[in-house]
């Protein structure tokens, strides 16, 4: 099949005006690539986590006015959905690619995960590379590098999972558009796989919480 690395055209999708026009290009160019990345990495993540991982490509079906500013493929251990579960994502904004482990606001066990992450904070700091990013909102492109956060910053992020209904915690890497465009497909896929190898630690922590 065609390359799984994102191209200038893929990034440019998110500058197209209008919901219908942007969605048309998204469906034709970006979505097949997200599906391809899903098919490529689902067995990798299944092996890393011990859970069978299912692929969920974002459909943006609820949008009626505003076009999406990003798109992604998610991986979760449930065939029917991913938003309530600890999951992984690969996606892109106009400016960069993201690779996340994600706990988002729909999760019914956020409080338990927050407590668990607070308890294992030293392990998380030592297991997650300092160049990785943390985000508190999957709907915004902003994220903070772990090297720029102290222990209290991380503790506050996890505390929000416990106490704030809409709180989220995402961890992973961001690759700028320029970086991605200068990578070979092999290097791009290797970078994502290396990130997942580190992020699997966070997923394995969540497996300690009984559902």
UniProtKB/Swiss-Prot annotation:
Domain of life the protein comes from: Bacteria
Family: Belongs to the UPF0637 family.
Name recorded for this polypeptide: UPF0637 protein BLi01683/BL05149
Organism: Bacillus licheniformis (strain ATCC 14580 / DSM 13 / JCM 2505 / CCUG 7422 / NBRC 12200 / NCIMB 9375 / NCTC 10341 / NRRL NRS-1264 / Gibson 46)
Organismal lineage: Bacteria, Bacillati, Bacillota, Bacilli, Bacillales
